[in-house]
Amino acid sequence: MGMQQRVEILKMLYRDNEILIFDEPTAVLTESEAEKFLECIRSVADSGIAVIFISHRLDEVMKLADDVVILRDGQLVFKEKTKNTNKNEIAEMMVGRKLEADSMINVNRQFKDDYILEVKNFRVNMPGEKTKDVSFKVRRGEIFGIGGLAGHGKTSISNGIFGMYPSSGSVLYNGEELNYKKTGEALNKGMAFVSEDRKGVGLLLDESIAMNMVYTDMKVNRNFLKKFGFFSQFDEKTSDEKAEEMIKELYIRCTGPDQIVGRLSGGNQQKVCMARALLSKPKLLFVSEPTRGIDIGAKQVLLNYLVKINKELGITIVMTSSELNELHSVCDRIAIIGQGTVQGILKPDSPNVDFALLMSGEGGENHD
């Protein structure tokens, strides 16, 4: 996806335009790739082309923009010269409340060598994100992060385990070989997946919030169905009640459980994806790019919720993200993927230089 986005960006830059509008152009790019792109946009603006840059990434806004405006709930709530404001003020205006500073929540948690997931010599043929030889183990009860540059294979791992792309190698779940080539096997075994492609894979855009939330649990576990002998019928009342519960728990902004998902904002759609995964009561949850393209308030809600369900429900989580700071803030360990393989596994409080070296392919001290 990152490479496709860059191609689209280049096509726009080569047209003879007086104004360019970019809507979340770096959402699928890593931090280093986004930085190079911002330099390009700055050069375009310096040449006399006006740029409207729409982004939830505050670092990018502060670095690139001359002026900043904030829309919240469809209204203009803030307008200022960038040099006269700061990230904290912008963030608070975006969400309408003060935000807590990021911190490393899970530093120095201890786990036994009880592995819920063991991946060995795993290869996934996912276009633009192939892995060549991935091996790692995930301890029961931890939040395991997967990071790396776009195009190096990090997002293909969860997709391969859930049978989305041709794969080979060994995947052990609770000590037993997982037949990941069989569609739906991971779901049947008690895993769940929140895809990075929420519109293409994660949601039924023309269906209601309630239907989207209960769909997987209904199909896999036969819940939310009224049974009449050999026949069954969708239990709309029960599904609406459960959807109402999840709407409140995840602070989903909507008109109710009957609202069509395609009409929700990106952040609220992502919360529906999260609710859908959790209603199947997984023991192991994979989340891929959970905060891509959503506002800072929704990001905080989702990240806090991941930590909450990990600690309160004991759900083991594998989180793939291009945002290293997010991995730092919630993960117990972080694997860096480069050139289709695991370059190293680090603790979240490991020196930044070690993360940088692993991402550059130069290697770093392993603090696992």
Which residues fall in each region the model found?
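Glycine-rich phosphate-binding loops of nucleotide-dependent enzymes
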Residues: 1-368
